[in-house]
Structures are given as structure tokens and as C-alpha cells.
Amino acid sequence: PIYIDESKIIVGGCSNGGFMTMRLLFNNPKYFSAAYPVCEPYTDKFITDEMINRIKDIPMWFTLAINDSVVEPMINELPTFQRLAKAGAKDIHMSVFSNVKDTSGLYKDANGQPYEYNGHWSWIYTLNNECQENGLQLFEWAGSKVNNK
């Protein structure tokens, strides 16, 4: 048999998966121990104060690139994060990158500099476990969360 520790269910997704991450949180706020929405397009103006209050106690780590031309951070993740903080969220984090560049050393542009990807591809940093805040890494942080609700 397969056993799932229901106190350690983490949800995350990139782009539309980030939208679905937020939707799952809004609809099931007591189910998840942590969440990591990446370049999520759940436009903040469609998020009510009641929705913010419903999810403010869920540990969350947002990731985005400022130059994302697909999902504009100024109308999506940034105001949502600010509203969560204002509502009293205690365990929220955000990794903000100016752009998305290759960090593997494998891909270079014509000038030999790290290749710059589309700014929407900030999941590259997430999936390479390069999202950090004060020595804390996203996946170590997420794995340490336990849902006692």
C-alpha cells in the first residue's frame, strides 16, 4: 500500500499551474501544509479580502521575474503578496528575479554571457532549487511544513 502523510501535502505550480495552486488554496484552505505558486496569473483584482483571509495562514512561497511579459507581476503576484502580508500572513516568502538567465553554465548568448530566457520562465529557478531567502531554500522550507488544521 501507498501511504500519504496528509499533514504534509504541498501544492505548487507554474504559470496556469500557479493559478490552479491559488484556486486550490482558496477552495481548500485547510488541506495543504504549504504552497509555492510560480508566475501565477490569478489577477489580484479578482481576489476578495475574504479569499485573502481564507489563505493567509497557509505557508506560501511566490516566485516571479519582474520582466515577465506573460503574467504581469504588478497586477498579479505582487499585490496579492502585499495583501497577504497586510492581512497578517506570518509565513510568506517571495523570490523576485529581474530576469531569467541560465545558471547551469551550459547555455550562452552570442557574447558568451548566460543565455536569457523569456521572463515568464521563472520556474527554472524554482525547479533548480535556486529560490532562497536568508539562507532558507524553497523546497527545504516546504518540506518542513506540517498542516495541523
Annotated model-derived regions:
Residues 13-23:
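Glycine-rich nucleophile elbow surrounding the catalytic serine of serine-hydrolase chemistry
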Residues 15, 41, 66-68:
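Residue-level signal for short, function-critical loop segments
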Residues 30-42:
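A conserved short beta-strand
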Residues 69-76:
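Conserved alpha/beta-hydrolase "acid-adjacent" motif
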Residues 63, 69, 85-149:
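C-terminal catalytic histidine-bearing segment of alpha/beta-hydrolase fold enzymes
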